[in-house]
Every structure is written in C-alpha cells, then in structure tokens.
Amino acid sequence: MKLPQTMLRSISVKHVRWPRILTGSKLWYSTQMAMTPEEKMITDKLQQELEPEVCKVQDVSGGCGSMFAINITSKKFNGLSLIKQHQLVNRILRDDISRWHGLQLTTKKSTGKGPASS
C-alpha cells in the first residue's frame, strides 16, 4: 500500500514510537544519564549501610519507579550466604520495596580489589 505524499508529510517524527534501544533509555545507558531521585535515594541508603565497592541502581520500569535492578558488591556480604545477602538488602530497603512492583537483585561478596564506584 502506497501512502499519498500529503499523508506522509502530515506524519511527524514526534508521533513515532521509537524502540527503547534507539532512544538511549535508562535500561541500556543508565551510567551515562543522571540518576532519578528514587535511584539516588536507594543508592544513598545502600552506600550508607553497606559501604559497597560497586552499587548500581537502575529504574527498569520505564521511569515510573515501580521496578528496580540493583547490583551491589560489598565486604559486608563476606561470610554470608546469597540468601542472607538478599535478606540484608531487603531489610535496608524494606519501606521502599513495599511500594515497588518488583526488584531484580544481584549481590556479590567483595574481593577487596575493585575501585569504589556507583
């Protein structure tokens, strides 16, 4: 089907829904973009309690703040099972988690070799 030129001219780029991967969504490029207030609040809580080597928090809900992916490496996890590590993070974020739809949590024990980053 061929569209008439007048119809093609009336379609504006702002009405096109670009795939997320092409728009630089936070899901793919969060380290290059500023953190949302919620991401910053979560990061601050985790840094205060766990003093992590690595602490990455991403809003993976498309920006509505209902689902987060958290990747954290801390010395405070040394000697703890994976379940205990997750329970510790859940305890720190208990009040926040109650408002969320979901959480993707990755925890790792510190090797003591990595630079601090967030």
From Swiss-Prot:
Task: Give any extra note attached to this record.
Answer: Present with 259 molecules/cell in log phase SD medium.
Phenotype on disruption: Increases frequency of mitochondrial genome loss. Cells show a slight decrease of succinate dehydrogenase (SDH). Cells lacking BOL1 and BOL3 display defects in a subset of mitochondrial [4Fe-4S] enzymes.
InterPro entries found in the cross-reference section: BolA, BolA-like_sf, Mt_Fe-S_assembly_factor
Please give the biological process terms from Gene Ontology that the record holds. intracellular iron ion homeostasis; iron-sulfur cluster assembly; protein maturation
Q: Which GO terms describe its cellular component?
A: iron-sulfur cluster assembly complex; mitochondrial matrix; mitochondrion
Q: How does it assemble?
A: Interacts with NFU1.
Q: Which organism is it from?
A: Saccharomyces cerevisiae (strain ATCC 204508 / S288c)
Swiss-Prot/TrEMBL keywords: Mitochondrion
| Family the UniProt entry places it in | Belongs to the BolA/IbaG family.
Q: Sorted alphabetically, which Pfam families does this protein's record hold?
A: BolA
Q: Please tell me, according to the UniProt entry, what happens when changing H101C.
A: Dominant negative mutant; displays respiratory defects that are higher than the BOL1 BOL3 double mutant
Which protein, by its recorded name, is this? BolA-like protein 3
- Predominant localisation class: mitochondrion
Q: What is the effect of changing C64A?
A: Partial loss of function
Q: What does this protein do?
A: Acts as a mitochondrial iron-sulfur (Fe-S) cluster assembly factor that facilitates [4Fe-4S] cluster insertion into a subset of mitochondrial proteins such as lipoyl synthase (LS) and succinate dehydrogenase (SDH). Required during the last step of iron-sulfur protein assembly when the iron-sulfur cluster is inserted into the target protein. Acts together with NFU1, later than BOL1 and GRX5 in the [4Fe-4S] cluster insertion process. Not required for [2Fe-2S] cluster insertion into mitochondrial proteins.
